[in-house]
């Protein structure tokens, strides 16, 4: 009888190893403003964050832009208040830009220096400090703060663009201390985020080089985050991701998580071949579940912290920037959540 009980609880014990089963829902206010009313699995209208947390999501990622408007500080404070009411933790993704920040775009915010690293280092410190202090004043706990978004090619260009790793390291150090010096009662985990999480060589080169300057220290940050999108490179196998995540933890002693990922329900003409160990997964709702289960298994095996599904409900942008037509966990025709959302509670 005891043996049978232990067998039955083994999956539950494995699932408990993932600290974060999250989603980035940064565009929810824009969607709601456009008239989108999300529906839960029962077909009832419900707030998106509640639908997700009811199905196992326990952390919400929010991108923060500097300029006033969509994704600005006020936008994110208001979103965080809604998220906090569900009990989910909050992860702030500071882009340090007025627009998208990624490996191809890292534009310095308007009014920030583009020709003096001393001034820019102070500006990133003061801005980060101000963001964190605003959340402290609003009595909103923050679990994670990412100092930059997909900064493989640096941040705050041109001063912080590769190959100027001394400037990159200095800017990251300043951003990190903006978090550390804040009034937040419980200090958030400080995270550095690169793309191509499956590419260990890329990860290693960035961290070895940045840390090698001596201007960024291991004590400056707590977590390493990676993006993992299987549809951008056939080399992005789960096996490669497993190797990379294992090596990151062994080499740098940091908590690691996949902070952006998703899987399509429709991908008629993918721009790139899919990885070999994922080709058997269909482009469907069931395929989304299978992908998330395999990803979760990989993360559990490597003792990674968890994953965040990027923009699962952005119905006005179903392809989410990829060559696939639809990567959402919500049907953009009906605004009803798909059954694949239940995967968060099953992994």
From Swiss-Prot:
GO terms for cellular component: extracellular region. It is found in: Secreted. Gene3D superfamilies: Glycosidases. The active site is at residues 150, 260. Pfam families: Glyco_hydro_53 (PF07745). It catalyses: The enzyme specifically hydrolyzes (1->4)-beta-D-galactosidic linkages in type I arabinogalactans. Keywords: Carbohydrate metabolism, Cell wall biogenesis/degradation, Glycosidase, Hydrolase, Polysaccharide degradation, Secreted, Signal. GO terms for biological process: cell wall organization; pectin catabolic process. Its EC number is 3.2.1.89. Residues 1-16 form the signal peptide. InterPro entries: Glyco_hydro_53, Glycoside_hydrolase_SF. One of its GO terms (molecular function) is arabinogalactan endo-1,4-beta-galactosidase activity. Belongs to the glycosyl hydrolase 53 family. Endogalactanase involved in the degradation of plant cell wall polysaccharides, and more particularly of hairy regions of pectin. PANTHER family: ARABINOGALACTAN ENDO-BETA-1,4-GALACTANASE A. This is Probable arabinogalactan endo-beta-1,4-galactanase A. The gene is galA.
């Amino acid at each position: 009888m005891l043996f049978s009980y232990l067998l039955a609880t083994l999956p539950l014990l494995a699932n408990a190893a993932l600290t974060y089963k999250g989603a980035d829902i940064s565009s929810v206010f824009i969607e709601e403003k456009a008239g989108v009313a999300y529906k839960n699995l029962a077909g009832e209208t419900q707030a998106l964050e509640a639908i997700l947390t009811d199905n196992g999501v326990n952390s919400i990622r929010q991108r923060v832009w500097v300029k006033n408007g969509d994704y600005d500080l006020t936008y994110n404070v208001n979103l965080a208040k809604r998220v906090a009411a569900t009990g989910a933790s909050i992860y702030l993704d500071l882009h340090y830009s007025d627009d998208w920040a990624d490996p191809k775009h890292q534009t310095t915010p308007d009014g920030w220096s583009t020709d003096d690293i001393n001034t820019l280092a102070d500006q990133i410190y003061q801005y980060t400090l101000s963001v964190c202090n605003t959340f402290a004043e609003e009595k909103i706990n923050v679990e994670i703060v990412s100092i930059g978004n997909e900064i493989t090619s640096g941040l705050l260009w041109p001063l912080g663009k590769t190959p100027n790793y001394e400037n990159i390291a200095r800017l990251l150090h300043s951003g990190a201390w903006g978090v550390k010096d804040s009034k937040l009662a419980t200090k958030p985990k400080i995270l550095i985020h690169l793309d191509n999480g499956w590419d260990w060589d890329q990860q290693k080169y960035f961290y070895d080089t940045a840390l090698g300057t001596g201007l960024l220290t291991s004590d400056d940050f707590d977590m390493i985050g990676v993006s993992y999108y299987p549809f951008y490179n056939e080399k992005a196998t789960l096996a490669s991701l497993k190797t990379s995540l294992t090596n990151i933890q062994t080499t740098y002693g940091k908590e690691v998580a996949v902070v952006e990922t998703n899987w399509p329900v429709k991908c008629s003409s993918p721009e790139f071949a899919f990885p070999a160990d994922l080709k058997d997964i269909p482009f469907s709702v069931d395929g989304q579940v299978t992908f998330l289960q395999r990803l979760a298994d990989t993360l559990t095996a490597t003792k990674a912290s968890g994953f965040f599904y990027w923009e699962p409900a952005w119905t006005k942008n179903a392809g989410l920037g990829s060559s696939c037509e639809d990567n959402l966990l919500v049907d953009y025709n009906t605004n009803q959540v798909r059954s694949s959302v239940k995967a968060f509670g099953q992994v």
